Curated annotation (Swiss-Prot):
Cofactor (UniProt): FMN
Protein name, as recorded: FMN-dependent NADH:quinone oxidoreductase 5
Protein encoded by which gene: azoR5
Keyword Transmembrane helix: no
PANTHER family, per the entry: FMN-DEPENDENT NADH-AZOREDUCTASE 1, FMN-DEPENDENT NADH:QUINONE OXIDOREDUCTASE
Presence of keyword NAD: yes
Reaction it catalyzes: 2 a quinone + NADH + H(+) = 2 a 1,4-benzosemiquinone + NAD(+); N,N-dimethyl-1,4-phenylenediamine + anthranilate + 2 NAD(+) = 2-(4-dimethylaminophenyl)diazenylbenzoate + 2 NADH + 2 H(+)
Protein family (similarity comment): Belongs to the azoreductase type 1 family.
Cofactor note: Binds 1 FMN per subunit.
Known EC number: 1.6.5.-, 1.7.1.17
Quaternary structure note: Homodimer.
Record's function text: Quinone reductase that provides resistance to thiol-specific stress caused by electrophilic quinones.
Amino acid sequence: MKLLHIDSSILGDNSASRQLSHSVVEAWKAAHPATVVTYRDLANDAISHFSAATLVAAGTAAELRDAAQKHEAQLSAQALAEFKAADTVVVAAPMYNFTIPTQLKAWIDRIAVAGETFRYTEAGPQGLCGGKKVIVVSTSGGLHVGQATGVAHEDYLKVLFGFFGITDVEFVRAHGLAYGEEVRSKAMSDAQAQISQQLFAAA
């Protein structure tokens, strides 16, 4: 079994989403000891944003690419291959300015590829990644679930993975982290309890 672990917070060791995503992965490994983990730190090893250079590289035959185009093509190919190979994907998605970090969006743009993770048919779009499990670690300073301010965060990720054909999407939440130490502590404690007591109860 293969697990892809994605971190995207810029806060390093001070990051709540990193702490919780690592707890999720450790709990998963305890339940599935044979799991092989691939780790991507999108903040410390950022993927360049989707650009005209990305499109040109994709449209240029491999033998004709220059060094920059080869680099762009390799970034896309590796990110896509890791995602497609994974049975389970753990995505740490802190909220920055009502949406996901720009580093996470850059990764998404490398894996959202027609003919690879989805395709268009006469009946409409069809996801090609059914059967995967996605666990999203959702953190935020405020309380946004069910609010208009949360649409570009959790709702966006639900739509995205659903578009890929993934229906097994779970959220581990620690919200209200900026509402004082007591609220933060409870939010983190509740999230850790969900991970240890509920998330893999059926495993």
